[in-house]
Amino acid sequence: MKKIHFFVVTLITVLAASCGNDEATSKLEDAKIVDPKSHLLTSIAGIEKKMHSSPQIDNIVAGQALQLYYEYTTNYPTDPATPDYLFKSGEIATAIQQYPQAYSYYKTICEKYPTYKLIEESYFLQASVLDNYLNEDEKARKVYTQLINLFPKSTYVNDAKAAINNLGKSDEELIKEFQKKNGGK
């Protein structure tokens, strides 16, 4: 009789414990089943808030933002927010003087998102990074020319033409030309 009683008590204890574990496991699984995209968007919103709360760029926070944008654009390349995050990445990379990366972000926009709302600006910024920071005059000329040909009515066309005319010129040459145009002043 003691054996049966012990067996029944043990069985009830095991059943009660297993029911509790299922509920605990279920709650744990529910907590783990968070949409990764939503989690990433929440993280991006948080880091953007942190960046905008300071008048100066913090390189560590900027690096964190670039990492989050990279994760998003890599995992969701067809999402409508992806070109925005690439553009923001280009701006941040330029601000923290990571010019090759900035160029790459703008180039990716131009190649993969031709209907993006800031496509003209992306071409111009891509060329500007090549021109002003990477000293790649011929590549810059090519991108400026693409901008002019693809978007002849763009507000960036005149700036692109002026930049092409100034490619390869030293600061002294540019100053002399400016003074000459303004009557030697």
Where are each of the predicted segments found?
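Acidic, polar-rich low-complexity tracts and alpha-helical solenoid repeat scaffolds
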Residues: 2-8, 19-185
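Hydrophobic helical h-region of N-terminal Sec-dependent signal peptides
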Residues: 9-13
